[in-house]
Design a protein with these regions (language model features):
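Extended, well-ordered protein cores
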Residues: 1-5
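N-terminal beta-alpha lobe that positions the nucleotide/phosphoryl donor
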Residues: 10-33, 39-51, 56-59, 67-249
Length: 249
């Protein structure tokens, strides 16, 4: 019954958010409730604009909630099950809190590495190895190493491997939340595989300092049409290919 009641509450909240544009004051409180309940900026924007939603609407929700002070706080994961006081660098973000458990210097002496997320076909342990090597190199160069990843199977989610580990989702919203707190020297995407690569263009649009492979180069390699055109312009042979989007194709 708890699952059914929770689902009903979320559905009711979703319907209430849809009335946001007609009552901004009530809408602000709804956004606060929605974030505590786990709604993303994308889901809030979709509830408001529905089929007319565009990427700019999601960004509007983000900027609006920030203007209201609706931002997540950072909490430490208790690795000792409350038996003893635990001060760890094992972190997560939540809207169900008041203050951060850690202090932020904002001195641009840290570098953030985005992990590979869940293992799947085409993205496995090799990207985890790359991420760990990046963390080791960052430390050797005198910077604080920061990892964002959520896969407990990986070596990169061992909090002894870096100065700060955010065990959290690899979405644009959450990554930007962390970057705004950390204010790092830069971010490394190219060691994490597909998921970080998918964020490259949007992070670049927010003027995030992407270290290593640039967002433009990542996009040129990821977009099959752009990559094919580049090979043609360079006179490099390539196999014939087609993009299939339906069964009839």
């Amino acid at each position: 019954m708890n699952i059914v009641r929770t689902a009903q509450e979320l559905e009711t909240l979703d319907e209430s958010i849809a009335q946001f544009k007609s009552d901004k004051k009530a809408g602000a409180e709804l956004i606060r409730r929605a974030k505590i309940q786990g709604f993303s900026d994308f889901q809030i924007a979709r509830a408001i604009w529905k089929d007319k939603m565009e990427d700019c609407h999601m960004q509007w929700v983000r900027e609006y909630r920030k203007s209201l002070g609706i931002v997540p706080v950072v909490k430490q994961i208790d690795t000792l099950a409350a038996e003893y006081p635990a001060q760890t660098n094992y972190l997560y973000l939540t809207y169900s809190g008041i203050a951060n458990d850690v202090k932020y210097l904002g001195d641009k002496k840290s570098i953030v590495v985005l992990g590979s997320g869940a293992y799947r076909i085409g993205s496995s342990v090799e990207f985890d190895w790359c991420g760990v090597q990046a963390l080791n190199t960052i430390r050797k160069e005198g910077y604080r190493s920061v990892m964002i990843n959520y896969n407990p199977e990986t070596v990169s989610t061992d909090y002894d491997m870096c100065d700060r580990l955010y065990f959290d989702e690899l979405t644009f919203e959450r990554v930007m939340d962390i970057l705004e707190l950390e204010n790092p020297h830069g971010v490394i995407l190219s060691t994490g595989g597909q998921i970080p690569n998918n964020l490259a263009t949007r992070l670049d649009e927010q003027h995030v300092n992407i270290l290593g492979t640039t967002a433009k180069s990542i996009d040129n390699a990821e977009d099959r049409h752009k990559f094919s055109s580049m090979l043609d312009s360079l006179g490099i042979d390539q196999p014939r290919w087609r993009e299939l989007t339906s069964l009839s194709d």
